[in-house]
Amino acid sequence: MSFSGKYQQVSQENFEPFMKAIGLPDEVIQQVKELKSTSEIEQNGNDFKITITTGPKVTVNKFTIGKETEMDTITGEKIKTVFHLDGNKLKVSLKGIESVTELADPNTITMTLGDVVYKTTSKRM
């Protein structure tokens, strides 16, 4: 199943507690909490390019499944990590954050840091 496509965020759960847990300042959280993001995923075999647009901020990450890559995080840090594909789930671990992007109807992303779980749901456009 291909992840390729454009997705519009439709809902999110536990945004503020999760963003505080990863260290985003309160003023930044307040500025972005009502913004809905758009994600574009381009998949060519095991090669991916993910472009996330939230308000004026655009983040682009490219990676190959199973190979170490450096990616930009929501906090602005660059982190080395490895992405894995497990059926319809794209998994990555970033500094203690476990992220699972599950391709379902709709598309669901769940991120966990300790016992704080952030869930965002997007719809394919």
Swiss-Prot record:
Its main location: cytoplasm. The lineage of its organism: Eukaryota, Metazoa, Chordata, Craniata, Vertebrata. This is Fatty acid-binding protein, liver-type. InterPro entries: Calycin, Fatty_acid-bd, ILBP. The keyword Transport applies. Belongs to the calycin superfamily. Fatty-acid binding protein (FABP) family. The gene is fabp1. PANTHER family: FATTY ACID BINDING PROTEIN (PTHR11955). GO terms for molecular function: lipid binding. SUPFAM superfamilies: Lipocalins. Keywords: Cytoplasm, Lipid-binding, Transport. It is found in: Cytoplasm. Pfam families: Lipocalin_7. GO terms for cellular component: cytoplasm.
